[in-house]
């Protein structure tokens, strides 16, 4: 087995990385950042997202394992003090596998050029200095005319991130669905939106067509794509998935409760 390590530069994280490297070496597990079988991320959910984008060209061939140096995350199964147990499992135990859907964006510019991007959590479109005006289509059928700060399209795993802060629903990651939420929409006689998040089926897609050629910012998992002439953007469930090796199970709704509610455990 060959593994790659992706981590942030925080002091507590670097200490965990150093200890993990020693454990891997003692078990004869090779660290190979170029051609890994498993990518282990150390930090938090943001670090795992960075690891996904670093290795997205290999996403069909690799699996991910997340180590959290703080509270338990949505993508990270192991805490920093459990790395010994994790390495034991790597060498002795057959993992179960969990796969989650990815968001595919196809951006068409005014010149007809196409740019394809992948996102693990979400993608947004905003206008740089003015209100966004755009027509929204579902399965190439007109749905609404939007006016506001922007639009966000998220995956089920991304539903606990930015989308939730916009009033979106939390969606179980086993559901292959996309959710679109509005960012500060303006409703009047010309621009009329549903003013509610929508969830679309796996065989459907969303197309956003900005009204005018202007400078737009498309974000995907915090990364940016800037372009002055975007003709349309298509959002759909990708044919690719991200896969995780699972050696211990934490119920998704337990993670949600721990992250957002934090009820006393004796209830």
Swiss-Prot record:
One of its GO terms (cellular component) is cytoplasm. NAD(+) binds at residues 45-46, 121-122, 147, 149, 160-165, 184. It catalyses: NAD(+) + ATP = ADP + NADP(+) + H(+). One of its GO terms (biological process) is NADP biosynthetic process. Its EC number is 2.7.1.23. It holds the Pfam family NAD_kinase_C. GO terms for molecular function: ATP binding; metal ion binding; NAD binding; NAD+ kinase activity. It comes from the Bacteria. It is found in: Cytoplasm. The active site is at 45 (proton acceptor). The keyword Transferase applies. It is an enzyme of class 2 (transferase). Belongs to the NAD kinase family. Involved in the regulation of the intracellular balance of NAD and NADP, and is a key enzyme in the biosynthesis of NADP. Catalyzes specifically the phosphorylation on 2'-hydroxyl of the adenosine moiety of NAD to yield NADP. This is NAD kinase. The gene is nadK.
């Amino acid at each position: 087995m060959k593994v790659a390590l992706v981590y942030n530069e925080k002091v507590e994280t670097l200490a965990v990385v150093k200890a993990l490297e020693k454990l891997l070496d003692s078990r004869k597990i090779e660290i190979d950042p170029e051609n890994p079988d498993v990518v282990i991320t150390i930090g938090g959910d943001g670090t795992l997202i960075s690891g996904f984008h670093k290795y997205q060209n290999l996403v069909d061939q690799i699996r991910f394992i997340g180590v959290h140096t703080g509270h338990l995350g949505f993508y990270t199964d192991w805490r920093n003090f459990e790395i010994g147990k994790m390495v034991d499992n790597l060498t002795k135990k057959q993992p179960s596998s969990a796969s989650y859907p990815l968001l595919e964006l196809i951006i068409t510019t005014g010149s007809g050029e196409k740019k394809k991007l992948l996102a693990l959590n979400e993608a947004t479109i905003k206008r740089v200095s003015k209100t966004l005006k755009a027509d929204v289509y579902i399965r190439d059928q007109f749905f609404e005319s939007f006016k506001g700060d922007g639009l966000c399209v998220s995956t089920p795993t991304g539903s606990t991130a930015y989308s939730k802060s916009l009033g979106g629903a939390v969606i179980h990651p086993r559901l292959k669905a996309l959710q679109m939420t509005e960012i500060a929409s303006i409703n009047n006689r010309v621009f009329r939106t549903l003013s509610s998040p929508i969830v679309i089926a796996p065989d459907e897609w969303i197309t956003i067509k900005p009204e005018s050629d202007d400078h737009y910012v498309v974000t995907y998992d915090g990364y940016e794509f800037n372009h002055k002439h975007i003709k349309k953007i298509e959002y759909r469930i990708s044919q690719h998935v991200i896969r995780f090796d699972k050696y211990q199970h934490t119920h998704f709704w337990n993670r949600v409760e721990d992250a957002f509610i934090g009820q006393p455990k004796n209830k």
